[in-house]
Amino acid sequence: MALRLLRLVPASASARGLAAGAQRVGRIHTSVHCKLRYGLLASILGDKTTKKLHEYSRVITVDGNICSGKNKLARDIAEQLGMKHYPEAGIQYSSSTTGDGRPLDIEFSGSCSLEKFYDNPKSNDGNSYRLQSWLYASRLLQYSDALEHLLSTGQGVVLERSIYSDFVFLEAMYNQGFIRKQCVDHYNEIKRLTLPEYLPPHAVIYIDVPVSEIQSRIQKKGDPHEMKVTSAYLQDIEDAYKKTFLPKMSEICEVLVYSSWEAEDSTKVVEDIEYLNYNKGPWLKQDDRTFHNLRMLVQDKREVLNYTTVPVYLPEITIGAHQGSRIYDSFRELPGRKYAPGYNADVGDKWIWLK
């Protein structure tokens, strides 16, 4: 599954949307634009990450259960601190940040469906783990985009969930009998290979909303698929957050926990963020050399996804060679997808031979 995403993503998937939605705020960051592709020569000529970092050059993630209010709080934090907001990565994250930005057919987007998961989480066609595997790869791409933006411009980023909290859904799926143990083993192997390559958030904000209130919000929202989510599944997500995620993250970054009504006061949350010491975690040990290595990784999206390709047979995410080749060839026939970004005349790219 990740191999399919690897083949369908250009090397610089974040280039198209790098500065989208970013704000220019005085004394907050050097620039919201990354004009040239970073490399060894740029580093030698003085493009050093440490020169761009300041007190607001942070990675902040907002976590919580379904319908816990993550989006609004994350947007408010980003706006008040002059950071860039990254909405939660979904199935179409890769297509939204590459090509013309339009959603692609399900065949090019993991062959999975969130609606189908809600309707029939125990479907025997493997949709549940295919969905989880694809979403992890999407979060990985987004996290690499966020780090690329921060290291290239100095502007802080605020994300809704991340690769560090994604596992809470896997644990809930397994506890509810939606996926097999082999799927859990495969997922954990991918985590083992990918997480060490990245730096964790500087701060995690968790919105603690009781399952009963979550269910009430879901019913009020009125999504016919989401309304089928059980309280047991939501409780397993909450348990994974509180028993595993928060204790682990508290060892390597700052953690703030708010109730649903406390999270509504974003000004108070921002004040708490500004009072944090940020005196633990691997960010303290970084220098221009380690930042250079990380920048080289996160700007190469094929390399980012390469870490997720584990050579193991798993029916839920395995497709045949002929089917894979057909999908790849069909993808390359789409507008703006045949060559690297900026080299496709069919979508209006100019001066191709001079690039």
Curated annotation (Swiss-Prot):
Task performed by this protein: Accessory subunit of the mitochondrial membrane respiratory chain NADH dehydrogenase (Complex I), that is believed not to be involved in catalysis. Complex I functions in the transfer of electrons from NADH to the respiratory chain. The immediate electron acceptor for the enzyme is believed to be ubiquinone.
Modified residues (N6-acetyllysine): 122
GO CC field: cytoplasm; mitochondrial inner membrane; mitochondrial matrix; respiratory chain complex I
Positions bearing N6-succinyllysine: 122, 285
Compartmental location: Mitochondrion matrix
GO molecular function: NADH dehydrogenase (ubiquinone) activity
Tissues and organs where the protein is expressed, per its UniProt entry: Expressed in the head and flagellum of epididymal sperm but not in testicular sperm (at protein level).
Cofactor(s) needed for function: FAD
PANTHER family for this protein: DEOXYNUCLEOSIDE KINASE, NADH DEHYDROGENASE [UBIQUINONE] 1 ALPHA SUBCOMPLEX SUBUNIT 10, MITOCHONDRIAL
Record protein name field: NADH dehydrogenase [ubiquinone] 1 alpha subcomplex subunit 10, mitochondrial
Cofactor comment text: Binds 1 FAD per subunit.
Quaternary structure annotation from Swiss-Prot or TrEMBL: Complex I is composed of 45 different subunits. This a component of the hydrophobic protein fraction.
